[in-house]
């Protein structure tokens, strides 16, 4: 009898095509807008998107792409593109046929792009030739796995030469007959292939499965419904996290699952254009690294626009208190989130619990500035070097370790790094944090960025947070610099606000920090030994301040 029952049972697989299927069934007429700089506004419904996805999926199958299996990559499709409607097509079409979507980081140096593509070995390369055609020949010369190039353009361009491989215009994919049924795929099949940003060495690759990404989509869509974000289908969303960066934090999937009535993709990152589109489309919900929020607030056109309806989640780096208050002065709602490339990425969001909702504004800000509390289906601890939980006192620093369904199983071709990350059944993030009695955490630093002075730790993020509140400070980074006596000492590198260039002094900053010493918030020995003023700070390919460059640049700053 049990055999008969089993024969009728359908083992439902959590695959990304199911997210699209639900969105189309529940919200067929919701709108996706693609509005690139200098281009015209293009609008499609969720139903129209599904038709595009099915046509592209069928066309890709005709290129003889092979599906993966449980924990085993199939054919890889590399994409080099900005935040466009075409990229959204591919976020669904490529994984839904069992292939792996490899999101090439557009901000890497050409050598790093070639390196990651050499490791990934994609069979099909889909590329925006308006911006990236100069990379085509060096990539094809070095990455011999590529047998077809699909080229995209907003300007009607065609490739400028014969590249020796099959060249297909993206529009030809859309002319294909739509795929009637997506193939059955094991939910453990890798859906995406990502690389870390490589701030401590060459970028490292790993994959995320359909199951992990579907559960991540459900969890994040649920978590953002909490106050103060209160995300709902009435929110018009803009995808500002680059789509080449950790799935754009899952927004191409979660915003559709969440039924947002309008989802806007602004193309390449032109901040004057983006501000205008936020205004004209009535955007109320977005997210990005602190640099993105900083650009929205400081662009010369920014004062022309009302940002008071915009709810914004900051992740990828710590939210400085000064940036939070600058955004609040414009009426914005801003909170923190946290995650990694290896974690798909979201692990925590600093939402408010019921007991927080009547707190004074300053107390709420303390919560928004924390890294947050784990979202559904994430288990999180903060541990010492012996993997023991640190006290939940908001003071003791340890490392964040996690479990969830959406983690890298391994780093491709790097068993040593895999062993270092997975220990005792927990994924070690490399992030130092404190743990509060209520379960919220706050990142103190990357373990590699903690300043080790005289055998004690100085968290650079805490100093940056305090310095950022000075009225003359635009951006700040604090790094550890070699010191003959103490091992390392902190040095602050500051970009002054307009009007403060040449006026702001080292003593101004040190005296400003003394007030926090006198209040007992930091010890005196944390005050930086040196303050350096610059016009700009170096950024990584994902828009974070590049402390590796700063440590190297200022390694002799305290030499006698």
Per-region residue spans from a language model:
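Conserved pre-ATP/AMP-binding loop-to-beta segment of ANL
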Residues: 28-31, 167-168, 175-195, 202, ...
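AMP-binding/adenylate-forming catalytic core of the ANL superfamily
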Residues: 108, 114-115, 125-127, 286, ...
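Structural core segment of the AMP-binding/adenylate-forming
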Residues: 96-172, 498-500
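Conserved AMP-binding/adenylate-forming
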Residues: 40-43, 59-111, 239-240, 457, ...
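Conserved AMP-binding/adenylation subdomain of ANL enzymes
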Residues: 214-236, 244-284, 299
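Gly/Ser/Thr-rich phosphate-binding loop
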Residues: 168-171, 257, 280-288, 297-366, ...
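AMP-binding/adenylate-forming catalytic domain of the ANL superfamily
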Residues: 152, 518-544
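Conserved AMP-binding A3 loop
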Residues: 43-47, 191-218
